[in-house]
Amino acid sequence: MKYCFLFFYILYALHGHSQAISLKQYIDSAKLRSPLLRGYESQILQLQIDSAIFQATLRPQMAFISNDFYAPVIKGYGYDEVITNKAQLSGLLQVSRNFLHSGAIAAQYRNLALQSQALRDTIQLSVRDLAKTITDQYISAYGDLLSVNYTKDLYELLKNEEIALKKLAQSNVIKQTEYLAFMVTLQQQELNYLQAQIQYNSNYLALNYMAGISDTSITSIAEPLLDGSQPPVLINSVFSRQYITDSLRIQNERRLIDYSYKPQIGAYADGGINSSLQYLPYKNLGFSVGFSLRIPIYDGGQKKLRYQRLDIEEQNRIYNRTYLLTKYQQQITALTRQLQSTESLFQKIKTQVDYTRTLIEAYGKLLQTGDVKITDVITAITNFLNAENTFRLNTVSRLRIQSELNYFNQ
């Protein structure tokens, strides 16, 4: 039969590995290989370096400063010596330091810490999004695997009866047309099995691709273990915490604005040579000390505008948080009701699958003696396939609802 080779090839490929891969393994692999998460983690490391750089700017800064020139006057032509002193030789070692208000220093460190926290919140949200994407694909593949297992069991069950029916047809115990009807059903079930295998292989390889796994061999996956029984709690979750971080950041930016308008003091000391080379330049060795003072007086209204900008940002933050809370409650309520409805049907559908399977097995025994009509067997097979498909769809639906609930409750 032209499908036999493909059938046994897919069967071998599917069971090429004995150990099923779990959902957690796929999620861990995706997190490990995600360039997006790696980029966020690199930004956190960069912020740590920025904090060290800021700390270094608070220490005394040392520099060597040299300004040297010579302005000759040739036949009365040249720069005015009163202005230029004709020449200058300057070589100074300068030490300077800016003295910031302790509150300004703390606010700057706080700003870097809040940026780091915002990145951590983003990482957690990205991890949830990534885990949900992998979970959704895993559930799709698992639903296909259920179809593979059901169609495989039914195919093997019918295949075992083929020889007995053939003998009954040759002995005229059953009609040749009934035997042909059975063979058509058997071949159709074989096609269903092969189609289920192909669909599973496609979703399985897509799952590997999304998780960053380069292995193209096909193996089974384990049943996803999801628990959507506990209602998610939004308080203290990353969805709520990101708005808390934004609020703290806005408050801290107000402090930074305030401190930027406070007086700023700097001090310096230098020593070296600073000479016009006009008279005893070796005596021009010396040192100096000084300080600088900056007091903002008027900035054209920039401070007020910067406050207004932060006010708009805070209003938008409050609106987004309120919107999230409202949508969250609506979504959780809807998902909880869907899960309850799905659970109530689950056991009934499972019982129907078991009944139809038992009926087919009973018909299989009767087929060996020709005591059952082939049409009844075909009807039972059709009922089994319908029940199995309903069970698979209900299983996938339940897993997807649990995945949605887990997304908010991790």
Regions found by a protein language model. Give the residues of each.
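Surface positions of alpha-helical coiled-coils, especially the charged/polar e/g heptad sites
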Residues: 22, 29, 36, 87, ...
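Transmembrane beta-barrel architecture of outer-membrane proteins
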Residues: 88-90, 136, 181, 264, ...
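A glycine-/polar-enriched beta->alpha junction
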Residues: 28-38, 48-60, 92-110, 121-128, ...
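Periplasmic alpha-helical coiled-coil/stalk elements that build and connect Gram-negative outer-membrane
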Residues: 49, 121, 127-241, 335-338, ...
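Bacterial Sec-dependent N-terminal signal peptides
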Residues: 1-34, 405-410
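Bacterial Sec-pathway N-terminal export signals of envelope proteins
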Residues: 18-61, 173-175, 208-253, 336, ...
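Amphipathic alpha-helical coiled-coil segments
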Residues: 39-54, 126, 130-151, 167, ...
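Small/polar (Gly/Ser/Thr/Ala-rich) solvent-exposed segments
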Residues: 61-86, 96-125, 260-287, 294-308, ...
